[in-house]
Amino acid sequence: MDWGRFVEEKVREIRETVGDSKAIIALSGGVDSSTAAVLAHKAIGDRLHAVFVNTGFLRKGEPEFVVKTFRDEFGMNLHYVDAQDRFFSALKGVTDPEEKRKIIGRVFIEVFEEVAKKIGAEYLIQGTIAPDWIESQGKIKSHHNVGGLPEKLNLKLIEPLRDLYKDEVRELAKFLGLPEKIYNRMPFPGPGLAVRVIGEVTPEKIRIVREANAIVEEEVERAGLRPWQAFAVLLGVKTVGVQGDIRAYKETIAVRIVESIDGMTANAMNVPWEVLQRIAFRITSEIPEVGRVLYDITNKPPATIEFE
């Protein structure tokens, strides 16, 4: 791929499409939205408004990381929106995975439209990539930036990366000068930790899975492993364990670590036993609500990478 030519073409397309108007971008800090943001910033400069929505479903330290990186280091117009209560309220009592994704997508776009009106933006730029719309089209699962979009969107949509796969986006991000901490980040689902909690999403469940997820990422990095994704899932199943001399019913965490090139297929990683033991020990020691840790050895297919 000639990335120089690709960037020239996309910058020209965005500039011609947006004209003298303003645009907002769904910025999450992941490689997809970050790369789309840099492309758009090259095209329209200060008329790009990066909107970061704290859904309450983000990784540990994510809000601080995004603000520091894009406001302080890249000098972008960054609008921080704390919408945690709104998302938790919308998901109250919801257990169906597909419904969860669609609700998150709907609320996400509602928040954007509100910010866009204040800014006077007419365009919404998203970091949608090929696997997102392929899986949505094939009815495998809805992606919040595809299937969750309302039919009557009040913003005109621009998706400059929609024909690229994840490995290509990483190459493009590197070409654009994004730091390694961005272009080598593991993929993170648009709905965030909400799809790593099986069943109803609550602040308490998110707190547990967020801590477990951080431990998995830390131990994988410490071991020098380079998986496609490594994360924790709260299964919503309590099992019996022993605490001192008494029986205790505690939560169960599943650990998922996979290798892949583009996310369309994936293999469970053959992780050294001592790494898995360390992960299990830390999760059960540092998160008192968890009493059992499982390792998922299923490939994609038949399973998807995420549990929901």
UniProtKB/Swiss-Prot annotation:
GO molecular function: ATP binding; GMP synthase activity
Cited CDD domains: GMP_synthase_C
Catalytic reaction list: XMP + L-glutamine + ATP + H2O = GMP + L-glutamate + AMP + diphosphate + 2 H(+)
Name used for this protein in its record: GMP synthase [glutamine-hydrolyzing] subunit B
EC number: 6.3.5.2
Uppermost EC category: ligase
Residues the record lists as binding ATP: 28-34
Residue intervals of the GMPS ATP-PPase domain: 1-185
Subunit relationships: Heterodimer composed of a glutamine amidotransferase subunit (A) and a GMP-binding subunit (B).
Chain's role: Catalyzes the synthesis of GMP from XMP.
Gene3D superfamilies named in the record: 3.30.300.10, HUPs
Keyword Nucleotide-binding: yes
Keywords: ATP-binding, GMP biosynthesis, Ligase, Nucleotide-binding, Purine biosynthesis
Gene behind the chain: guaAB
Highest classification ranks of the organism: Archaea, Methanobacteriati, Methanobacteriota, Thermococci, Thermococcales
Pfam families: GMP_synt_C, NAD_synthase
GO cellular component: cytosol
Pathway connected to this protein: Purine metabolism; GMP biosynthesis; GMP from XMP (L-Gln route): step 1/1
Organism field: Pyrococcus horikoshii (strain ATCC 700860 / DSM 12428 / JCM 9974 / NBRC 100139 / OT-3)
